């Protein structure tokens, strides 16, 4: 029987991404745990020694043991593609990272814009039937990111590991007809950076693995305000120093701005479609004319792949060229935007008014999986 007092407990929040899953409890200023969205299975059976071999590994432990494992990434381009693996990921977060019993806490799970109906319903089904949570809610990642900046109307420009999207939001509701998506994001930038560095002919004293390329990307990559001018600069002016794990120092140049450039020119990767600025402009102009000026004046960046130095300035410059003359444009780049969706979820689930939003186990029992379509939008 449902106990309404359970809604007074801090809720569990899972913000699921292609690369990382952020988990924590409502009312806190940031996620307690950030775990790689990966599950690894042993490639070979261990010889019998009396000790039982683990059947799978999750997150950083899987990456650490990756040579002996077959790695599965259950979230691809923002969407869940393997429910068995996502169940293992969530179970790991509940039991080992947060140390909570799912049957004792309300749970909010974030979802990408335009999440397919079957994925929404499967998430609810798994939470209620597999984890037996007492209450559940599914919330749009972009809307939550906007909430974290204390706004309810604006355009969210979100770029994570697997997908980049522009989402117009009016009074707390996303406008799905105007959402733009680009399947170029952090992992594509890392892969391109790796190819560019290897093609440069530079000898690396250690293997250029994904973790190393990710670190170079996060520490040194930037978005050029004028890519053509950057190309004409002297080599010594663009070189930046990077210290490798073995202590060797290397110097990297043009590749540091060439890799993130694909966010603005995805055709460089053979992906047809508009870049970031054109996506933002398209999303806004698909909205009612009465709110377009408001949206241009409240653009909020979200996600780890918007953290590149210079990205906000480049986006502003290109949007000023695309927007009608005289339309004021404001871009907010919160320093904690890597976690902004999670923070937004922490804020809203802490509000006393949110209690009426939860789908309870009793609701699920009465209405079934379709309840998520009526209650979460």
Curated annotation (Swiss-Prot):
It is found in: Cytoplasm, Cytoskeleton. Transmembrane segments: none annotated. Gene3D superfamilies: 3.30.420.40, Actin, Chain A, domain 4. Keywords: Cytoplasm, Cytoskeleton. PROSITE patterns: ACTINS_ACT_LIKE. InterPro entries: Actin, Actin/actin-like_CS, ATPase_NBD. CDD domains: ASKHA_NBD_actin_Arp-T1-3 (cd13397). The keyword Cytoplasm applies. One of its GO terms (cellular component) is cytoplasm. It holds the Pfam family Actin. Belongs to the actin family. This is Actin-related protein T2. The gene is Actrt2.
């Amino acid at each position: 029987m449902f106990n309404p007092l359970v809604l007074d407990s801090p809720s569990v929040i899972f913000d699921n991404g292609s690369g990382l899953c952020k988990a924590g409890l409502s009312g806190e200023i940031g996620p307690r745990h950030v775990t790689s969205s990966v599950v690894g299975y042993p490639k070979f059976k261990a010889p019998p020694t009396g000790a039982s071999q683990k059947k799978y590994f999750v997150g950083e432990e899987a990456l650490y043991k990756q040579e002996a494992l077959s790695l599965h990434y259950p979230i691809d381009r923002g969407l869940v593609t393997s429910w068995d693996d996502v169940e293992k990921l969530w179970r790991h977060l509940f039991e080992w990272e947060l140390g909570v019993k799912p049957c004792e806490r309300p749970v909010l799970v974030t979802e990408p814009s335009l999440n397919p109906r079957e994925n929404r319903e499967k998430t609810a089904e798994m939470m209620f039937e597999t984890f037996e949570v007492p209450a559940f809610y599914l919330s749009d990642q972009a809307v939550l990111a906007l909430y974290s900046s204390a706004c309810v109307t604006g355009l969210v420009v979100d770029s994570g590991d697997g997908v980049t999207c522009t989402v117009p939001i009016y009074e707390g509701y996303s406008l799905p007809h105007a959402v733009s998506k680009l399947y170029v994001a952090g992992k594509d930038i890392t892969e391109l950076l790796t190819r560019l560095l290897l093609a440069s002919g530079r000898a690396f004293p250690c293997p250029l693995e994904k973790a190393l390329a990710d670190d170079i990307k996060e520490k040194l990559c930037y978005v050029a305000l004028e890519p053509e001018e950057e190309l004409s600069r002297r080599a010594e002016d663009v070189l930046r120093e990077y210290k490798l794990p073995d202590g060797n120092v290397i110097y990297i140049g043009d590749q540091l701005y060439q890799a993130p450039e694909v966010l603005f020119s995805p055709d460089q990767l053979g992906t047809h479609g508009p870049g970031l600025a054109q996506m933002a402009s398209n999303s806004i102009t698909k909205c009612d004319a009465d709110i377009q000026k408001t949206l241009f004046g409240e653009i909020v960046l979200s996600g780890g792949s918007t953290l590149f130095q210079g990205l906000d300035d480049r986006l502003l410059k290109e949007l000023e060229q695309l927007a009608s003359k005289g339309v004021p444009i404001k871009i907010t780049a919160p320093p904690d935007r890597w976690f902004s969706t999670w923070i937004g979820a922490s804020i809203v689930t802490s509000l006393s008014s949110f209690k009426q939003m939860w789908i309870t186990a009793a609701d699920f029992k009465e209405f079934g999986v379709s309840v998520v379509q009526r209650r979460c939008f």
